[in-house]
Structure formats: structure tokens, C-alpha cells
Amino acid sequence: MAAARKSNTRKRRVKKNIESGIAHIRSTFNNTIVTITDTHGNAISWSSAGALGFRGSRKSTPFAAQMAAETAAKGSIEHGLKTLEVTVKGPGSGREAAIRALQAAGLEVTAIRDVTPVPHNGCRPPKRRRV
């Protein structure tokens, strides 16, 4: 009774030839996540400050956001990406740094769009911090 065993090898990543895509930058007070997708929304590459080894308050710095954007850009350039639209979400400090890093990596930014959700007086916000 030999049970069918699942092989240990991972599926090799197929190189996609994509000319243009969308960079989704989510910049919160604690972290910055950069996901680069094709125009249909399928992820090509992603990176975040936490995934790069930044911990604690260093995750929320503009430098950490810059490094995350560079890493995501390198992964997407391998798939043939040349032009990007950028959507930025959130109030964090790494917004501008991440956009600049994408441009410095050799990607042409065609549009920058702010898609930060703004409530029309929805949920009650958390109470103010007193430090």
C-alpha cells in the first residue's frame, strides 16, 4: 500500500514578459509594503520593510520604504517591466521615498494616484495616545 507522496521540489517561477504594471505602495505608521502587479492585478513581485529585516520603529522609516521599493523593483525588472503606474495608500512616512526609489531603479513612472481610504464618518477612530 504505497501512498502517493508529494514531491519536495517547488514550482519554478515562470518569467513573464510584462511591459507595464502597477505599483501598490501601502505605507502605514508601522510598515511599508510595496507590491508590483500587472495591469490585471496579478502580483509580479513584492517586498516590505519587515521582510527585509527591519524591526520595530525602524520599519516605519523612509529608508526602509526605499529599500523595500528597490527590492520589489529589481524583481519586476527581471520579468521585463519598464513602465509603472503608482497607487499610494496610507499616511506613513515612506510614501515619497518609495516612489523615488522606483524611479531610481530604472522604472518609468507614468502616473501617481493616492487611493488612501477616507471615511465619510464611518467607524469611531481609536482614542488619542497620551505619551
From Swiss-Prot:
<keyword id="KW-0694">RNA-binding</keyword>
<comment type="subunit">
    <text>Part of the 30S ribosomal subunit. Interacts with proteins S7 and S18. Binds to IF-3. Interacts with VmlR. Interacts with BrxC.</text>
</comment>
<dbReference type="InterPro" id="IPR001971">
    <property type="entry name" value="Ribosomal_uS11"/>
</dbReference>
<dbReference type="Pfam" id="PF00411">
    <property type="entry name" value="Ribosomal_S11"/>
</dbReference>
<dbReference type="GO" id="GO:0022627">
    <property type="term" value="C:cytosolic small ribosomal subunit"/>
</dbReference>
<dbReference type="InterPro" id="IPR019981">
    <property type="entry name" value="Ribosomal_uS11_bac-type"/>
</dbReference>
<dbReference type="GO" id="GO:0003735">
    <property type="term" value="F:structural constituent of ribosome"/>
</dbReference>
<protein>
    <recommendedName>
        <fullName>Small ribosomal subunit protein uS11</fullName>
    </recommendedName>
</protein>
<keyword id="KW-0687">Ribonucleoprotein</keyword>
<dbReference type="GO" id="GO:0019843">
    <property type="term" value="F:rRNA binding"/>
</dbReference>
<dbReference type="GO" id="GO:0006412">
    <property type="term" value="P:translation"/>
</dbReference>
<dbReference type="InterPro" id="IPR036967">
    <property type="entry name" value="Ribosomal_uS11_sf"/>
</dbReference>
<dbReference type="InterPro" id="IPR018102">
    <property type="entry name" value="Ribosomal_uS11_CS"/>
</dbReference>
<keyword id="KW-0689">Ribosomal protein</keyword>
<keyword id="KW-0699">rRNA-binding</keyword>
<comment type="function">
    <text>Located on the platform of the 30S subunit, it bridges several disparate RNA helices of the 16S rRNA. Forms part of the Shine-Dalgarno cleft in the 70S ribosome.</text>
</comment>
<comment type="similarity">
    <text>Belongs to the universal ribosomal protein uS11 family.</text>
</comment>
